[in-house]
């Protein structure tokens, strides 16, 4: 797996955090995958902490820096769980299907991928 970071002032800490999280999730040695992590000043007019988009080959994670650093790391953990979900094919790239079941009409808090990400983000 190739991991690229952009716009983080605490690169060494973020790299260690990501490496440990990927190893914990047992996806640190995936071949032919790219993980791009970008830090921006804010998302969605300051309301969103982060988001992930991707598929089985590449995931892009964006983290907002207008929150405390520890919250940024928690958000990064949450989005890394989504990365694992994309890489494994559990989560569709259009964020509507989980394990081939359509959840396009489900509320945010009822989406299985969000339930899983919230469950494990603090581990």
Where are these regions (language model features)?
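Hydrophobic or amphipathic, alpha-helical segments that drive membrane association/targeting
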Residues: 1-9, 13, 33-45
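Short helix/loop segments within enzyme catalytic domains
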Residues: 121-123
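Short active-site segment of divalent metal-dependent hydrolases/proteases
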Residues: 77-85
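Post-HEXXH active-site segment of zinc metalloproteases
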Residues: 70, 74, 86-115, 119
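Hydrophobic beta-strand residues in large extracellular and virion-surface proteins
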Residues: 3, 18, 35-37, 59-63
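Catalytic zinc-binding patch centered on the HExxH motif and its immediate surroundings
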Residues: 36-60, 69
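Short pre-active-site segment immediately N-terminal to the catalytic Zn-binding motif
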Residues: 60-76
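Zn2+-dependent metallopeptidase catalytic core
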Residues: 9-32
